[in-house]
Amino acid sequence: MTLLVPFDGSDLAEAALRRAREFASYRDEAVVALTVVPEDESFAEERGWIEPGEPYDPEAVCTEFELRIAEIDDDVTFRCEHPPPSEHPTATTIDNVTQTIRRVAAELDVSIIFVGSENAGRVSMPVSSVGGPLSTDAKYDVHIVRRVE
């Protein structure tokens, strides 16, 4: 089995990665950090991956996160995915990111997803978090990390 950490470079994603590694040591499971990088430039700006007006290179984002993951823990496997455009006209970028995470989780036979999010899982689900939609899938457990410490 595998533990999966959706990684967007935020402090909470780093905290989720550290918690997943701690948990993995008790269960002897592999940890995969997954960065989902859509073509949506505004999504990259909202996440702080690029500054407004800065050229957006999704491959450069993948490379940057791969290096960060290796600095945090070189035993973690890094994976970067680019979601295809949705066939549904009302789908948001978050929907595409969530679908990509679910697909990878199924492919890797994930036992637990560790999500770093300030607002995932609350009664009202914001559209900016993948935590809420991921927590509805019973194929795996979800550990939501809300604090960095």
Regions found by a protein language model. Name each.
Residues 32-34, 81, 114, 143:
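Hydrophobic/aromatic beta-strand patches that form the interior of the parallel beta-sheet core
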Residues 107, 111-149:
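Gly/Ser-rich helix-loop-strand patches that form or flank binding pockets
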Residues 16, 97-98, 127:
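Amphipathic coiled-coil/heptad-repeat helices and related helical stalk/stem segments
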Residues 40-113, 123, 148:
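Charged, low-complexity cytosolic intrinsically disordered regulatory segments
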Residues 23, 68-72, 133, 137:
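Alpha-helical structural signal in soluble globular domains
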